Amino acid sequence: MTDEAEDSGPGGYAAARLRLLTEGARSGPPRRRALAELTDGWLAGLFGAATEEHTGISLVAVGGYGRGELSPRSDLDLLLLHDGRDDKAVAALADRLWYPVWDLGIDLDHSVRTPQQARKTAGQDLKVHLGLLDARHLAGDLGLTASLRTAVLADWRNQAPKRLPELRDLCAERAERQGELQFLLEPDLKEARGGLRDATALRAVAASWLADAPREGLAEARRRLLDVRDALHLATGRATDRLALQEQDQVAAELGLLDADALLRQVYEAARVISYAGDVTWREVGRVLRSRSVRPRLRAMMNGRNGGKPVAERSPLAEGVVEQDGEAVLARTARPERDPALPLRAAAAAAQAGLPLSRHAVRRLAATARPLPTPWPAEAREQLVTLLGSGRPTVQVWEALEAEGLVTRLLPDWERVRCRPQRNAVHLWTVDRHLIETAVRAAGFTRRVHRPDLLLIAALLHDIGKGWPGDHSVAGETIARDVAARIGFDGADTAVLATLVRHHLLLVETATRRDLDDPATVRAVAQAVGTEHTLELLHALTEADALATGPAAWSSWRGSLVADLVKRVSGVLAGEPQPEAESAAPTAEQERLAVEAFRTGGPVLALRAQTEPPADSAPAPSSPSSPSFPSPLSSPSSPSSADGPEPLGVELLIAVPDQAGVLPAVAGVLAMHRLTVRTAELRSVPLPDGVEGSVLLLDWRVAAQYGSLPQAARLRADLVRALDGTLDIAARLAERDAAHPRRRGVEPPPPRVTVAPAASRLATVIEVRAQDAPGLLFRLGRALEAAGVRVRSAHVSTLGANAVDAFYVTRGEGTPLPGDEAASVARGLEESLRT
């Protein structure tokens, strides 16, 4: 210890502490031990300077400090233990200990108790009891500290049947509140499931002698999380356990890792080890407690049949697999070394029965099972399909296989996606867990398709290409071909699986970003899919993939668009005649709105909550001649109350005399009223014979971001002002943004605007990918107006914080843009979004 550290004063300790944290070794156990030892010496010096009495009183470290796990900004958990002597003298001693800690700005969790008080408090407060399990003597009466440790540990073991269920419930409640560490983009290293608190809970279970946690990899997982927390404290200068996005690169650099993705992957791997150990441990705790509550033979008699005879302790599930005490285990006659399909058979049997696969069984399979031949025998492939088709129980069984490395042994390509983060707020899961979740969802659709096996394998493989650079669909197609052949599919089935993986995004992207009335759109999808059976599989895979992604990726609105596209493509594949591309004639309602707009010289608004209005009714227009339009855009019958986070919304029809600036004006007014645009179409409507002039008709589907939708009359009034220039939409939106600034985390990727070649024969398709923000469509509309192009239709899609929009644009006379002009418009749009 340095001379400065030997100085019991705050200055000496502070200097030595600073030197250790800034000039010492990187984050890791040696530095944590050194920091704990340095702090121990300082506190012992404070204790010695504050009192000459060393009997009947001691200073004790508890909790994380008791374990010697001091991170740079950790608080100090201290207990001043005394034998009940003069309270004033003890209080004075406590002040002489606590104030120097506070003077250095170190957080302190402190208490002053007798051993009896400490035990009583521990009996009433589970968290206090957990902290005392890690009690460590610092100074004073060693015997007093040792006696407390012995008593607290004895209490813990005696009370384990009561305390462990409380601890299990505490862990479950915390997991529900904080989420799972292994899937969060900004995880709490301490509180989330699989974090440091769960690791501490497993130590407490082991201390009870009632059950023990799996030890393989657990200490290493805990060390990794502690190392990350150390680096996080140094990077932020704060006592935080939340690994925020903006700190991840700096933390990765502090740990010598390549980048933030490598950091998250290490964190996820550690959390997965701790989570799985927790699952196994708590199952064992439950088993032991059940066995203590009822004698085994009595329990067997109570559950028995045949005149009360005891039932067998083992029930067969499959060849070589039995159920025992709520788990799937290997039969006594099982020989993994002679049965290469046994790992998959055991996993499938466990999942089908809704049982966890015993850890002992998995370890034995991993240690002794022979590798499968290539190609796999039919039984192995069928067992994999059975496992994937078991629904929700598949997840825990797959995690058991993963914990012992069996998944990557069966599917080597899995290693590239294992624990791989997805830096997209839309995704709830890592890549590998998303693939399993997709299979779980697909299991519910197996009655919709003619080949459930192909659907389930495609679900497992559809994002496998994310472990390689480039377009993951293209990379995934190659991997899918290799995997399909390796596991025993024939050439035809392999081709179908490759098509499903290559085009797993085709339906949803086309349905939400393309004009489905354009025959070229439908023909392109039909050409890519090839057959009706493949289309059927792709439809089910699309929905399963989206549902497994997260709530922002699927809704009744998206589902209806995809179903419409599938119906049209199915017609093409069936050889049904397709209509030629032409502008649809206006309906009677649209023509009526156009005439009203021309007559009044201003915009006319109408709404339609249903997809199709009743034949004998039409929505009343909102115009100067009908000022009493009373109802808001929402109504009890509106599909906005449909299930899913994205309601269909309402159809908003706007007719306005042809003039410049209509698109940005409408988009801006809708943004002002916090309306989300689902789809947008704009076209010129000819007036009846004998009437000169033209009217623009905008057919948009909108929904409120939150709250109720505004009155149509309010929308019309603001639109009139926007069109005549008396309403400065840009200023209003800027004013609102300034009044409610959004917290910024990491800098989002820059916007990207591209031209989609050959996407339509009717128009040029310009795709925009950008960070979603209020008024984005308004800004795009202004830029398109400035470019002098006409917008035929817009297809708007928002996924989490990402906007993916497609605009069908033409020249003024209605023809597609030449290539160079289209590229120039795209560049202009991109520049407008960057400024």
Swiss-Prot record:
Transmembrane segments: none annotated. InterPro entries: ACT-like_dom_sf, ACT_dom, HD/PDEase_dom, HD_domain, NT_sf, PII_UdlTrfase/GS_AdlTrfase, Polymerase_NTP_transf_dom, UTase/UR. Residues 651-736, 765-835 form the ACT domain. Its EC number is 2.7.7.59, 3.1.4.-. Residues 610-645 are annotated as: Disordered. Uridylyltransferase (UTase) activity is inhibited by glutamine, while glutamine activates uridylyl-removing (UR) activity. CDD domains: ACT_ACR-UUR-like_2 (cd04899), HDc (cd00077). Residues 317-650 are annotated as: Uridylyl-removing. Residues 1-316 are annotated as: Uridylyltransferase. It comes from the Bacteria. Residues 631-642 have a biased composition (Low complexity). Belongs to the GlnD family. This is Bifunctional uridylyltransferase/uridylyl-removing enzyme. It comes from Streptomyces coelicolor (strain ATCC BAA-471 / A3(2) / M145). The gene is glnD.
